[in-house]
Amino acid sequence: MTLVKQDSDGKKLRLSRRNFLKKSIGMGVGAAGAALLGYELPGVNSVANAAGIEQHDTMPMEISSDYKRYNQKNTVFMRAFSGDQIVQADFFKYVGKKTGEIPQEGGEGWGQLEYAMDDAAWSVEDDVNGYHAPGFANLGLYNWEGKVSPNAYKFQTPELASQAVKKAATFFGADLVGIAPYDDRWVYTDVITDPKTATLKPNVFPFEPTNVIVMAFEMNYESFQAAPALLEGASAGNIYSNMGVTAHKVATFLRRLGYRAIPCGNDTALSVPLGVHAGLGELSRIGILITPKYGPRVRLCKIFTNLPLAVDKPITFGVAEFCKTCRKCADACPSQAISHDKEPSFKTITVSTSGGVKKWALDAEKCLSQWAQVGTDCGICVKVCPYNKLDEWHHDFVKLGTRTPARPILRFFDDLFGYGKVSASDATKNFWNK
């Protein structure tokens, strides 16, 4: 996109998104760049932290001294399987629309072509892993059992072991890989492993893990622009299908080296704090992980292992500060499930809120209600997030590592250039016609 503005002599000035921002950065202030276009920018005096990536020795989140581990029975999906009337109707309405048993009324973007795409994308996850996606453990490719070599391979150093594991994980399909130390704070106290009985049992590992390998997978950008229509669901489903295959391969790799491995997707433990602990990204207003490279447009899986590994440090790159002033996801959320509060807090919204961490709490019940309306996992919040871009302007800030007052007004630029405003119908057409 190119902005066009006339100067005082009536001549047209053309400025691309990237050159516009680079001009602003070159002047040292976002306001200078905006002045080229004659705009006044709100919040320009609120200077954010450095835009570069900073490493930390401890978790960059405030955790309560009385933090209690989360029980999986409280996730909105497990509540539905357990018969919770508050969420069960919405859950089965969502499933019914997703499978086509309940007719869709969404119009373009919900046609047979898109249904076929969505079903195909989810096919490996659904046909091989069964009920894994809602959070059931030890199913399909995420099986906890596997032949372990009796001869443990000895790496010279934990650093070399981590290097080998990351190489294998990216070779097998992961886009990002980080390693966290085992921390039982993020592990569910109890789990439900049988979708038919929804029986709760203590979450016990068959060995003592020492580390967690966390992998992030990029979802397709073009199809995600169709959110909340079916191509967004296909983008997520394709990754769920690929994620199980990669997790299984990495677990097999570890077992053949003579070490134990438990591959997990949405089950067993909280993925987002593990992603933060492994240095993959920051916690956001949406409640999901934002990575420097792909923003929030990723899915996560993890593998618990007893292989000695060198761990990665948690990082920050300005997400928390930016989320305080942006609120674009909260404004766009049809069900208003995302907090509008400026500051994160320890308050909980529903029983599904994982407490004890200072954050913006998501209303999972309202979120599921939106899923029930559209018959997909929505994704509007990810679509509109200013960090959800291909290699474009927000990456310039990260790469340059410059101190600039522009970070608080990135949403202004994001809106100015029309990001996240493409309709589901138009995005669906664009996807098929490109």
What residue ranges belong to the model's regions?
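Catalytic cores of enzyme domains
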Residues: 166-167, 172-387, 399-404
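N-terminal secretory signal peptides
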Residues: 1-15, 19
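C-terminal/domain-terminus segments
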Residues: 389-413
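Ser/Thr/Pro/Gly-rich low-complexity linker/stalk segments immediately outside membranes or between
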Residues: 43-52
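Long, compositionally biased charged/polar accessory segments in the mid-to-C-terminal portions
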Residues: 399, 411-434
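A short, surface-exposed helix-loop junction/capping segment
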Residues: 139-150, 230-231
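N-terminal export leaders
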Residues: 16-39
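Extended, charge-enriched "interface" segments that sit outside catalytic cores
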Residues: 64-134
